[in-house]
UniProtKB/Swiss-Prot annotation:
Taxonomic lineage of the native organism: Eukaryota, Viridiplantae, Streptophyta, Embryophyta, Tracheophyta
Protein origin, superkingdom: Eukaryota
Protein's name according to its UniProt entry: Extensin
Span list, region Highly repetitive: 18-253
Posttranslational mods: Hydroxylated on proline residues in the S-P-P-P-P repeat.
Length: 267
């Protein structure tokens, strides 16, 4: 094989690996040291403290109490009640078509709150819970623990160790430990819980429900309106979907190999 061709072949073969990029090391730029700021010493005592002027005491001039103007008593002009003829109002009751007797409708007005008088019965079962007060629960078991005081615990075994004292110490003065004061807490009187006031709701008088006015609609002439035929909904025929075409297969373009130009052959 010709040496020039072998060099060209080798350069083509080894050109597939990209050259490693080694950046030139930059010298570390030294950070400039900030100049130390030395403030000029101010003479502290040269400036006498200027006394603040006392603000003048503002004494507001007493305003005379402005008398509130009494609002004029509104006396409505008496309307003559006789000018309003109440005759046209009784005419709607006359507009009760007799041919349609609404006999089942008057029965609901008969359902008046008259059977509600049992509500006037005082709520006797409610006062019974207030009678269950915590007063019969005497806190007697609590005073019993205070009776368990340290007094029955005689500190006699503790004075015995002071008897085991060196001979220079006179055993005649064994410092007996002071008996701890028997802490007998003052028995708190059982604070009876305040009995909640028996809430006796004021019996509300059974408010009679106003009888609803018997609404007698005007008799509509039956069968005068021909039944409108409901339009038949249009049958929904879905449009046939075209057969799903396969997406075009993506053929990636081959990457352009950026191969450097071969070095000139060595002769």
């Amino acid at each position: 094989m010709c040496p020039a061709f072998s060099i060209f072949f080798n350069s083509r073969r080894y050109s597939l690996t990209p050259p490693t990029y080694t950046p030139s090391p930059k010298p570390p730029t030294p950070k400039p040291t900030p100049p130390t700021y030395t403030p000029s010493p101010k003479p502290p005592a040269s400036k006498p403290p200027t006394p603040k002027p006392t603000p003048p005491t503002y004494t507001p001039s007493p305003k005379p109490p402005t008398p509130k103007p009494t609002p004029p008593t509104y006396t409505p002009s008496p309307k003559p009640p006789a000018t309003k003829p109440p005759t046209p109002k009784p005419t709607p009751p006359t507009y009760t078509p007799s041919p349609k007797p609404p006999t089942p409708k008057p029965t609901p007005p008969t359902y008046t709150p008259s059977p509600k008088p049992p509500a006037t019965k005082p709520p006797t079962p409610k006062p019974t819970p207030p009678t269950y007060t915590p007063s019969p629960k005497p806190p007697t078991p609590k005073p019993t623990p205070p009776t368990y005081t340290p007094s029955p615990k005689p500190p006699t075994p503790k004075p015995t160790p002071p008897t085991y004292t060196p001979s220079p110490k006179p055993p005649t003065h064994p410092t007996p430990k002071p008996t701890p004061p028997t802490y007998t807490p003052s028995p708190k009187p059982p604070t009876p819980k305040p009995t909640p006031p028996t809430y006796t709701p004021s019996p509300k008088p059974p408010t009679p429900k106003p009888t609803p006015p018997t609404y007698t609609p005007s008799p509509k002439p039956p069968a005068t309106k021909p039944p409108t035929p409901k339009p038949t909904p249009p049958t929904y025929t879905p449009t046939p979907k075209p057969p799903a075409t396969k997406p075009p297969t993506y053929t990636p373009t081959p990457p352009v190999s950026h191969t450097p130009s071969p070095p000139p052959p060595y002769y």
